[in-house]
Amino acid sequence: MKLRLLTATAGIAVATAMLVSPAAMADEALVKAKGCTACHANEKKLVGPAYKEVAKKYKGDAGAAAKLAEKVVKGGQGVWGPIPMPPNKVTDDEAKKMVAYILAM
């Protein structure tokens, strides 16, 4: 009985981990296509902060999505260290999608 429960629980955990919405996959592809991964990664700091660090820092901040989308478009500096993030050639809609993807981590 315990073995069945353990097997079922493990199976559910694996299946849940494998479920990624098509929208999230598209937003991840957008982040890669726009070159963001040259400076950022999901789990570790490269030139800029890890996406998970960004999500953690802005968790619960109702204005974070708009603030970060503007930084993606216009660039920014001083929040994560001395190296500035340059402006990016993305539309406002693309920036919002990318930020939503990052904040969902």
Residue ranges and their predicted role:
Residues M1-G11:
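Bacterial N-terminal signal peptides that target proteins for export
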Residues A29, Y101-M105:
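Short hydrophobic/aromatic patches at helix-to-coil boundaries
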